[in-house]
A protein has these predicted regions:
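Non-catalytic helical/linker scaffolds that mediate oligomerization, partner binding
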Residues: 1-265
Length: 265
């Protein structure tokens, strides 16, 4: 990819075999995201093992700060019926509670009799589950082996929890900053501003992140001004609410600072 102009194309690795599970750590390290393909995986391993493999892969992706998709047979009965079984509804909800970034339909929307209903049902279950329980907090990092971006992201999330902030707004070139913020379990929406359209599209996969393309934010003060504008118009934040703003100062490519402001002040 690098040699043919695709340096910024991201790789989603599909885990569908015992070999993939056995080598998961190495695959995760080289991947930008993971798809847990339960249907194919269930052909090769005992059915009773698949749920635990799914949980393991989601947990490791969360810890690495990389998106994970849970896929296959999530609402399988809706290929034939207009409503899912209660077990299927629970399956979708439990994947979200475990920390998956995305849930994916396949046959339900590709060849089923009720594709629109299946999509609406998955969206309804997802929204309700998010209302029940927000993100899970990952252990705060420590030691000299973590990056500045990760330390700042963790601190921003901890601050948002402590102060009951309503939004986190961050600036990103590559998408790394919002992924690291998501890793540490914020309970509020993450707004990512970027001047790169490809980065904005790629962030659509990251749970809790909404990305906007914003040009002309070359100076730190420009970012803070735009962040204030977005916060003032966001449905989750009212005048007087606190917002955490995360960006980089001086060194491009490094997220190294955050600050807290009140909406409308």
């Amino acid at each position: 990819l690098d040699d043919n102009g695709g340096k910024n194309i991201q790789i989603i690795s599909k885990i569908e075999s015992q070999e993939g599970v056995d080598n998961f750590d190495e695959i995760l390290e080289l991947s930008d995201a993971i798809m847990v393909a339960r249907g194919d995986l269930g052909v090769e391993v005992p059915a009773e093992e698949v749920p635990f493999m799914q949980k393991m892969m989601i947990r490791k992706c969360n810890k690495a700060g990389k998106p994970v998709i849970t896929a296959t047979q999530m609402l399988d009965s809706m290929i034939r019926n207009p409503r899912p079984t209660r077990a299927e509804a629970g399956d979708v909800a439990n994947a979200i509670l475990d920390g998956t970034d995305a849930v994916m339909l396949s046959g339900e929307s590709a060849k089923g009799k009720y594709p629109v209903e299946a999509v609406k049902m998955m969206a309804t279950i997802s929204k309700r589950t998010d209302e029940f329980k927000k993100f899970k907090t990952v252990e705060t990092p420590g030691g000299s082996d973590i990056s500045v971006t990760e330390a700042i992201s963790s601190g921003a999330v901890s601050t948002s929890h402590a102060l009951d902030a309503k939004l986190i707004v961050c600036w990103t070139k590559t998408g790394r900053a919002p992924r690291m913020i998501r890793k540490y379990g914020p309970t509020v929406p993450i707004i990512a501003l970027t001047d790169n359209e490809q980065t904005a599209r790629q962030l659509a996969l990251v749970r809790g992140v909404r990305a906007y393309v914003a040009k002309g934010l070359d100076k730190t003060d420009d970012f803070f001004a735009k962040a204030r504008e977005i916060a003032a118009n966001h449905e989750e934040a009212n005048k007087g609410d606190l917002v955490v703003m995360v960006t980089g100062i001086s060194k491009e490519g490094t997220t190294n600072t955050f600050r807290v402001e009140r909406v409308g002040e």
